[in-house]
């Protein structure tokens, strides 16, 4: 067996050689370019750097987009080779057993010499903004990329953790189904969402991504392979795995809830012209006030200014069910490369001053924000929504998050939190007005994303890192309260207006507001709170019990260790604040 595994790894190295070469060539090209610039420019070095910083759209257009395209092809080729040619007889059980055996081998090392466990998945393949230092850990390869089974009768998809959202969409939609919670970013993985968090426009009906997971298959710190469900002996672990970020075990498969779907989504765009109006609309259309409210399948709000917003209601639709010729003449595939970015399309409806209806193909609806990475791409390529750019270069968008992380330098890493903001925050929906006011004061960045979402009280005492919602916020006659994701992305308005901006103060104020109203920060983004403040925001009571029960202490980093920024964001933020004054 050992010899077979050695041959397998050797074959893998040979077959993945093109990917390795591509990676090295890109690194070398970047290093040479920087060296040439540094040598030739001499006294003009700093002005040149300033020019590149102020015109980064050109850099992305002529370097990042083509290189990202090649890079993505190399990654896809590597995965394709692994799936199709490396070991055609490989089974899920065999792959899991190999991971289990690696963990058991690690367990034989004297405790004093052991490093904590983590996956060997490179940092640049994750969608987080941070770079956890994996060199301090014992890395376990998790080469699990397969959809294992679709149980059409019980509407359950069984898949391995590295399957991406795009792959699932392409698999399920032609069959007439979709995930109950399907993230809009195609490169997100099912496992990353399971051990992190996911929320979409269907979440006002079913809750967070974790609520749609019926079963986890996990390799524990002592090398056991266990099935984790809410109704078996591992129920405590079941409720702690979400938001754990790989600090309680290694995920090797999961089972997800699937819902029947139709070919189209019938979208209604409703404009709002005051803050009170859109706040009341979100409460009503989400069913937060009344459990009998007939809610749409999809609900989303895009807030373009303090008093202007568009609320989108979406319902599954087929042509035969909607004979309205006017509506069916407006089928809009919003993901075509030459079309306006989705949020710009929404903004045009707001500017027109009237409500609008149209049909969007289901797959395009599910990935509608992928091309512009919501609206982050505008900060990278200010001219990216220009019709000429879309026509000739739109098919290259977006630059792959993996490539952007892969080419991140220390300076660019600082910019991700000092000159930009990437935050998703779970907050009680009845505080939406206060959320918008605070985000405006701190970041002055538009638009803002709002997805309503149920947070459940599972009636079991401690229920993982998220507390049960207070009874005062629970929708009468139910076991859930309506929260929402507030998404803030892009360059703070203060910096665009050349005004003083302190990223440290802004982020710490936002985190304090979140704690005060009983909310939670998504942990993919940089945190500025200390460990004590972190434990005020999240309930780690059950988490700590589970870590002890499953021998995680010493075997995996703690949650705070895993997700805290690898750089001193507070000190760096203060330095940038002084520069902006």
Name each region found by the language model.
Residues 55-62, 66-78, 404-410, 471, ...:
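Activity-critical C-terminal alpha-helical subdomain
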């Amino acid at each position: 067996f050992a010899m077979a595994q050695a041959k397998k790894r050797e074959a893998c190295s040979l077959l993945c050689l093109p990917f390795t070469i591509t990676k090295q060539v890109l690194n070398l090209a970047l290093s040479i370019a920087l060296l040439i610039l540094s040598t030739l420019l001499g006294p003009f070095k700093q002005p040149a750097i300033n020019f590149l910083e102020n015109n980064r759209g050109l850099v992305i257009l002529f370097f990042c987009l083509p290189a990202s395209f090649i890079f993505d092809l190399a990654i896809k080729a590597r995965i394709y080779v692994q799936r199709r040619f490396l070991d055609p007889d490989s089974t899920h059980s065999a792959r899991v057993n190999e991971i289990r055996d690696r963990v058991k081998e690690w367990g034989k090392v004297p405790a004093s010499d052991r490093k904590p466990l983590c996956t060997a998945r490179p940092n640049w393949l994750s969608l987080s903004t941070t770079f956890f230092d994996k060199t301090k850990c014992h890395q376990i390869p998790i080469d699990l990329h397969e959809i294992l089974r679709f149980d059409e009768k019980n509407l359950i998809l069984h898949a391995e953790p590295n399957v991406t959202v795009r792959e699932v969409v392409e698999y399920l939609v032609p069959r007439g189904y979709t995930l109950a919670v399907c993230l809009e970013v195609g490169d997100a993985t099912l496992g990353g969402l399971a051990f992190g968090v996911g929320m979409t426009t269907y979440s006002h009906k079913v809750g967070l991504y974790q609520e749609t997971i019926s079963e986890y298959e996990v390799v524990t710190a002592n090398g056991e392979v266990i099935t984790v469900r809410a109704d078996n002996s591992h129920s405590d672990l079941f409720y702690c795995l979400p938001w754990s970020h790989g600090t309680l075990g290694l995920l090797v498969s999961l089972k997800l809830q699937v819902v029947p779907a139709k070919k189209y989504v019938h979208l209604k765009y409703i404009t709002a012209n005051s803050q009170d109006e859109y706040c009341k609309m979100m409460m009503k259309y989400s069913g937060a006030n009344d459990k009998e409210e007939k809610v749409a399948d999809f609900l989303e709000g895009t807030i373009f200014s303090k008093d202007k917003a568009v609320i989108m209601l979406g319902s599954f639709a087929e042509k035969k069910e909607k004979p309205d010729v006017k509506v069916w003449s407006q089928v809009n595939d919003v993901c075509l490369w030459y079309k306006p970015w989705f949020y710009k399309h929404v903004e045009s409806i707001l500017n027109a001053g009237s409500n609008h209806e149209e049909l969007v193909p289901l797959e395009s609806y599910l990935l509608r924000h992928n091309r512009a990475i919501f609206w982050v791409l505008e900060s990278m390529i200010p001219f990216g929504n220009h019709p000429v750019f879309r026509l000739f270069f739109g098919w290259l968008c977006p630059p792959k998050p993996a490539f952007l992380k892969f080419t991140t330098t220390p300076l660019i890493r600082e910019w991700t939190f000092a000159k930009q903001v990437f935050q998703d925050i779970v907050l009680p929906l009845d505080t939406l007005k206060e959320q918008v006011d605070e985000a405006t004061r701190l970041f002055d960045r538009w638009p803002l994303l709002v997805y309503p979402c149920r947070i459940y009280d599972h009636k079991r005492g401690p229920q993982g890192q998220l507390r049960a919602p207070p009874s005062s916020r629970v929708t009468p006659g139910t076991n859930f309260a309506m929260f929402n994701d507030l998404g803030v992305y892009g360059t703070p308005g203060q910096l665009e207006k050349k005004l003083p901006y302190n990223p440290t103060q802004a982020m710490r104020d936002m985190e304090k507001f979140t704690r005060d109203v009983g909310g939670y920060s998504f942990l993919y983004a940089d945190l500025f709170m200390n460990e004590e403040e972190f434990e005020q925001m999240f309930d780690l009571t059950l988490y700590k019990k589970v870590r002890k029960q499953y021998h995680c202490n010493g075997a995996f980093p703690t949650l705070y260790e895993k997700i805290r920024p690898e750089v001193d964001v507070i000190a760096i933020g203060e330095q940038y604040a002084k520069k902006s004054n």
